[in-house]
């Protein structure tokens, strides 16, 4: 399978057996991103790593021959997923028409319809040639737990959006790249 990332990870399968195996795994671990971190020579025993926007996840061993799965260890058993906030995918247009993707994390109990007049932290990623991804971030969860909405945006130049998007950032530091951040703030308001 080939792996790529949009707002969450996605896979393209080259054979029906791999696809069927992964679909079985996904049904059992719904709501989590799943990575295959190891596999035996016969490719029927897999080591899996899960995570989500609310948890660092766990490791599992999966035997595809008998469809048995066993949890090996929770990565962060002290984190209660029920106390964490959802990381929502968002998209907006920059002032020059470029689509900018990102994430909005709202305090628990809020959604896009009822989140009005919340304090907001605008949290652009470093780099600039990096990106924000869907997954657990303790800093973001801390801020949401304290009542802040947190906006993360993948401004022009962020990786994973193709060559044209990447090159649109050349010689644009402090200019269009900054405008993308400002435009995200205006979109949120």
Please report, for each region that a protein language model flagged, where it lies by residue.
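Gly/lys/ser-thr-rich phosphate-binding loops in alpha/beta enzymes
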Residues: 1
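Short loop/turn segments immediately following the C-termini of beta-strands
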Residues: 4-5, 51
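A short, flexible beta-alpha/helix-coil linker loop
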Residues: 6-8, 127-128
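Alpha/beta-hydrolase-fold serine-hydrolase catalytic core, especially in secreted/extracellular enzymes
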Residues: 17, 28, 65-67
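A short helix->beta-strand "capping" segment at the edge of beta-propeller domains
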Residues: 19-31
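A short linear hydrophobic-aromatic micro-motif
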Residues: 32-36
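Serine-hydrolase catalytic core recognition
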Residues: 37-189
């Amino acid at each position: 399978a080939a792996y790529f990332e949009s707002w969450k990870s996605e896979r393209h399968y080259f054979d029906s057996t791999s696809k069927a195996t992964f679909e079985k795994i996904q049904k059992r671990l719904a709501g989590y991103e799943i990575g295959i971190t190891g596999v035996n020579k016969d490719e029927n025993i897999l080591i899996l790593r899960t995570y989500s926007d609310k948890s660092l996840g766990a490791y599992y061993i999966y035997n595809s021959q008998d469809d048995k799965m066993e949890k090996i260890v929770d990565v962060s058993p002290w984190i209660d997923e029920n106390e964490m906030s959802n990381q929502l995918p968002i998209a907006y247009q920059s002032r020059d028409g470029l689509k900018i993707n990102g994430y909005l994390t709202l305090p628990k109990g809020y959604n896009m319809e009822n989140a009005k007049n919340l304090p907001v932290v605008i949290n652009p990623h470093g780099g600039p040639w990096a990106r924000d991804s869907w997954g657990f971030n303790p800093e973001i969860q801390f801020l949401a737990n304290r009542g802040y909405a947190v906006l993360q945006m993948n401004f022009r130049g962020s990786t994973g959006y193709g060559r044209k998007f990447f090159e649109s950032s050349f010689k644009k530091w402090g200019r269009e790249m900054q405008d993308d951040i400002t435009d995200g703030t205006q979109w949120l308001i």
